Structure formats: structure tokens, C-alpha cells
Amino acid sequence: MTLVMSPDSSYGRYDAQPPVDGGMVNPVHREREPELHIEFDGTTVLCRVCGDKASGFHYGVHSCEGCKGFFRRSIQQKIQYRPCTKNQQCSILRINRNRCQYCRLKKCIAVGMSRDAVRFGRVPKREKARILAAMQQSSSSRAHEQAAAAELDDAPRLLARVVRAHLDTCEFTRDRVAAMRARARDCPTYSQPTLACPLNPAPELQSEKEFSQRFAHVIRGVIDFAGLIPGFQLLTQDDKFTLLKSGLFDALFVRLICMFDAPLNSIICLNGQLMKRDSIQSGANARFLVDSTFKFAERMNSMNLTDAEIGLFCAIVLITPDRPGLRNIELVERMHARLKSCLQTVIAQNRADRPGFLRELMDTLPDLRTLSTLHTEKLVVFRTEHKELLRQQMWGDEEVCPWADSGVDDSARSPLGSVSSSESGEAPSDCGTPLLAATLAGRRRLDSRGSVDEEALGVAHLAHNGLTVTPVRPPPRYRKLDSPTDSGIESGNEKHERIVGPGSGCSSPRSSLEEHMEDRRPLAADDMPVLKRVLQAPPLYDASSLMDEAYKPHKKFRAMRRDTGEAEARPMRPTPSPQPMHPHPGSPAHPAHPAHSPRPLRAPLSSTHSVLAKSLMEGPRMTPEQLKRTDIIQQYMRRGEAGEECRAGLLLYRGASPLQVDVADAPQPLNLSKKSPSPPRSFMPPMLEA
């Protein structure tokens, strides 16, 4: 295998961010030089995004051609990919890198790909030297991996190393637990009730830090045991973290399963004390978890596992290939198979009469994972409730102190506090009366939580020094329920009267205060919205008369001045109904509208809309062509008048009769109604015709 890295490849600056998937090679550190993040497969540089064969240094990281082109298209076209539907935690590998483009782009950005990291030119010699040194170190790591793989193939050696690792890191072996159990039965020392986790015997007042420190050395033992398993150091940092995070509680529970004493129905705690099953608190409703844990512990203890079997079973629980997020699944599967074969060998030696014991032991893994999930959920609930309880206690202390301080000022104003008075909204308390202050403060917190009845909100009588103290609280304001028959719009005719229903003979401060507030409340008309007022107001104009005025003929505007004058002289005179135009004067005139009932008379619409009337009375605006035709007609009319005057003068002078003018020789006027020339006709001036 050769290194795919040409001298003319484009290289850029190296980011100092830690690798996402963890390299198998420790980077070469030099002063004032960026850290080199490269993954090798022998002598081949791998892509930082998908693990494929890298083609060079692109956009700041070593990547393949596929990831380089994908990142270039994404940033140049500004593509917005659809969000991931798997919690944005998809594993980007060579075989599935095209399934989730959202997580692939996220991985590209996480490993350090950037448009600004592009640099053109050859690879510097110093960079080449660093890469070659990393390759050599990768070769040595490869040799170490081959040695570890050979160790995995050696079953007796693998078995011995796993058992030795378990005995060195576990404090609760079979012999030690037997001694602790005998000592606890002879001299039982019962611890105080603890939380849902049955292996913590600390008192209730311990902090979370003490709770964590009690299990710190036990958890550290499980982590050290995992590091001593052959082949575990060959995994990447991410794979190590994934295996430990998923199987830590499972392995810890398998180690501590011998601490449960089923006959005595108790637990041997880490400090050697006994704790009864019934004394375990179920603060997080963990009764089901406790019962399931005891049942599973009884099932496991009935198998009487040896230390070698427990060590190998813990290794199998930790090295499981079906954990989500693993990258080197092949190596994990190989380790799991080797450990399982070693456990089969040990069981065959110790339990030759039980051939199905291995299957029976492996069937407990689903129940173990279920208990781990329940424990994690209840632990989260416990932490949330514990923090909430501390917060409530702090708030309770803060509420009591200001309550007593405010009582000093109130007592100065009223020496007797609030004895049968409604002067203040809440009952004050004096510093010298702690019982009264504490009682009222407790009532105040109950009222704020809304857990008291309607009767408890009434008068509270407290006997103190022979006086009846009656704290009066301001009544809460309730929203008025809407009636099913209420449309939401009032008619304005309702009488705002308070209906007094049948009530009790005695009155409470709350009822008197509500009556006082209702008396001071303004009328509903003042609070009525604008929409209700508009709907309740009478119409500004009669709809029928408005339609009549709108549809009157245009002819009425010819006599607008006369109508206006009559309207000014008689503003309340009824307007006659317009008569329709008839083609024959002798035809009977029928009214355009049927006879209406007499209604209030108003001024004509033309007097109120003067602008509209003037615009309608104005003559129509003529186009330039129409104006030109009008001028020509007027010129001909002037010529005819002038010629008639001349002929009349000549006739008077000669004493002759008027001559009929023959228009055959005279110029013919233009016929403006037709485009073709009109035939010759006799022309008579308008004045002669008249």
C-alpha cells in the first residue's frame, strides 16, 4: 500500500482541534508547529470525514475526493440540507456517507474543513518530514496491533490475563464477600435508610459529592479492568468511550451482585453495614426498580459463579459489538467472540454436568440492560427532585424572614395587628409572636399553591393573648364564565342591577369586599367596545331613501338651482318622486315607485353633494377633433348670416322680392356625419328658416 499524496496537491493550514474519531497514531509534537491530525491504514492516509482513502489535503484536512466535492458543493451553492431524523448522531463511514447529508456536512465542519483553509502550492518539506515520521510511528503501532491480535488468538493466555485483571481491580471477590457476610451476620450493624440505589449506605443529609466519592474507587476499578483486557487498547478513543459509557453500570452491577443477601432480604453495603430491603426509600418512585434488582440478584446468586466466570462475564458485558456509535466493529466482534469462547472453556471445566449453562447465563443480558436503563432514568429523576427540594427549602426560608420584618411596620401602624379589621390585605405578624407568624406564613404558602378548599379561604381565627385575630386576604379575581346563550354583543338596554340570590344570613369580608368593588365598578356602557357601540347606534340614513336618491334620473340636475333655492327656503319640504319619461304625451303617467308611507322630509341630495352636481352639469369635454369640427360649423354659420344681410340690403334697395338663393354654385358645407360627400341640396340659413 502506497501513500496517496502528490507533491502538487493543494495544502493549507492545520487546525489545532482534536480529532473527532481519534487517531491510532500519536501526533508528532514540535515547538511552534500545529498539531498533525492524520489517520493511517498502514502507509495510507485516511479521510478524516468518512475513513476512505485520502487523495490530499483539501480545505484544511486530509480528505477523499468524495468528501472534498461534497463540501465544495455545499459551501458554493449554499445548500440547506434537511435536518437529521436520528438525533444528528449518524456515523459517517465510507459505505453510508451518502445517507445523511446533514450529518456529513456537520462532520466536515467538525473535523476542520473550511473555505479559508485552502492554500495552493507544493507540500512543504517540513510537512513531508512530519508525515513520514507519523507513518513510521503508525507502522510501529501496526506491529503492536498484530502482536495484540496474536494474543487474542492465544486462548489460554487471554483467559489468564482477564482473570488476573479481575482479581487485581475488584475488591468484592468471592472470598472477601463471604468474610463480609459472615461478619455482618454475627454483628449486624444496620445503616440508615438510603436512596433508591441500594448500594449507598450514606445518611440522607450527605451531598452529591459524598455520594459520588463513595463509588469513585469502584468505578475506577471497572475502568482499569477494561484497559487490561487484551485488544482494548487497539480501539480508538471514541470506541473506548462508547463501550465504557454503555456497559459501565452493567459490569459494576455484575461485580456487586454478590452483596445481595436473599435469605436475610438485605444488602451488604460498601462499608460493611447491613441495610434492610424495607428500609430503602423510594423517593423517586423506585419501588419497582428495587424489587426488580433483588429478583435479578437472587437469580444470579443462585448460579454460584466463580471469580473467573464473573471476570469473563464482566469482560463480555463491556466488549459488546451492538453498542451504537462504534466505528471499529470488526475488532470488537473479534474480541467478543474470543472472550465468549474462553468463558465456554471455563464453564465446560467447572460445570460439565450443565451443558446449557452458558446460554442460561447469556439470557440474563437483556434483563441486565433493562435494569441499567431503569436505574439511569430514576437517577435523573432523583437528581431533579433533590434540586427542586433544596430550592423550595431556600425559598421557604426567604419567605418567612421578610414576613416577620414587614410585621414590624404594620404593628407600628396598628397596635392590635389586624384584629377584626380589613385594613390590610394580609394579616401582619410581630417579631414577638413567632407562633402567629409561622402559622400565617404556612397559610400563605398553602394559599399560593392552591391546595386549600373554598372554606379554608374564609375567616381564620387565631387565639392569641385573649384576642381573636382575623386575617383578611384580598379576594382572588375570577374570570366570569361565558354563558352558552351569550353572543358576546350587548344590546345596550340591559339594566345593570345586581341580582341578590338566596344567601346565608351572615356575611364574610370577602362578600362585602366584592359588593364594594361591584358598586364602584362603572357602567357596562363605559367599558363597551367600539364595535358594540356602532352596532347599537341607529342608522345615519334610511336605506330605502338612499337607494331612491341614488337611482334618480340624471334629468333632475337640470333644475338643481331651482331645487336648491326651494330647499333653502323650505328645508323640510318633501321631495316629489321622479316621473319617468314617456314617448307619448298623452299616455298616462305612472309613478316610477309605488306609494310610500309618509316619512321625514330631507333636503335634496344635490344640495348636499354640490361637487358631484357641478361635475355632472358641466358639459362633456371634447377631443381636439371635435373642437375643430365645432369651429368649422361656427365659421359657416357666420358666413351664412353675413350673406343674408347683404342680399336683404340689395332687395330693399332695388325694391324687388327676396331671391331664392341657389346653392348649386355656392360652396357646399361639410357633412360631418358622413365620410362620403353629401348630394347637393338647397341651403337655407338658420335665421331664414326661423
Curated annotation (Swiss-Prot):
Gene Ontology MF term list: nuclear receptor activity; RNA polymerase II cis-regulatory region sequence-specific DNA binding; zinc ion binding
Record's keyword terms, sorted: DNA-binding, Metal-binding, Nucleus, Receptor, Transcription, Transcription regulation, Zinc, Zinc-finger
Domain of life, source organism: Eukaryota
GO biological process: cell differentiation; hormone-mediated signaling pathway; negative regulation of transcription by RNA polymerase II; positive regulation of transcription by RNA polymerase II
Record's compositionally biased regions (Basic and acidic residues): 562-571
Localization terms from the record: Nucleus
Zinc finger feature spans (NR C4-type): 47-67, 84-108
Biased composition (Low complexity): 414-434, 589-604, 667-676
Pfam families linked: Hormone_recep, zf-C4
Bias kind Pro residues: ranges: 573-588
Chain residue ranges for the region called Disordered: 411-434, 467-516, 562-604, 666-690
ATP-binding in keyword set: no
InterPro entries: NHR-like_dom_sf, Nucl_hrmn_rcpt_lig-bd, Nuclear_hormone_rcpt_NR1, Nuclear_hrmn_rcpt, ThyrH_rcpt, Znf_hrmn_rcpt, Znf_NHR/GATA
Domain NR LBD: 154-401
One cellular component term from this protein's GO annotations in UniProt: nucleus
DNA-binding region, residues: 44-120
Function summary: Orphan receptor possibly involved in the regulation of genes in the ecdysteroid cascade.
Entries under PANTHER family matching the protein: ECDYSONE-INDUCED PROTEIN 75B, ISOFORM B (PTHR24082:SF473), NUCLEAR HORMONE RECEPTOR (PTHR24082)
Family to which the UniProt record says this protein belongs: Belongs to the nuclear hormone receptor family. NR1 subfamily.
Name this polypeptide is given: Ecdysone-inducible protein E75
Protein's organism: Choristoneura fumiferana
Name of encoding gene: E75
